[in-house]
Amino acid sequence: MKNLCAIVTLAILITCGACQAIAGADADSAVALVKKAVAYYKANGLEKALDELSNPKGQFNAGELYVFVYDQKATMLAHPNNSLIGKNLMDVPDADGKLFRKEIVTTVTEKGSGWVDYKYKNPKTKEIEPKTTFCEKADDLILCCGIYKK
């Protein structure tokens, strides 16, 4: 009986640890996807990169994780939702009125890369939820990938 309790306890601890690892991997996955997109852009050029980054079935759209691209004025250059491409979103606030795209531009201009927090409607839950986006500057582009905070 003691062995059974020990096995069950160990299984619970392993499961909890795995859940934490998966939750923590979201941020790592977002960073990795942006880094992969930057490398793709540098290897293939602007036109091919924007085409691939705008492809809803492309290698940079992994369901909840996808890369989108702004120029330095927060005009959308690439996004799996093609209806956003060409729109200047600099002055479009989040649910709390925060001009987070201005913060994205400032962050990459000053630091080269970084995380920006804001609130956004989650398409899965239809609720406004806290979100954070990793952004990195590559030449005049800003490549980003966001995750909902859990």
Model-predicted regions and their roles:
Residues K2-K150:
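N-terminal membrane-sensor/transducer module of prokaryotic signaling receptors
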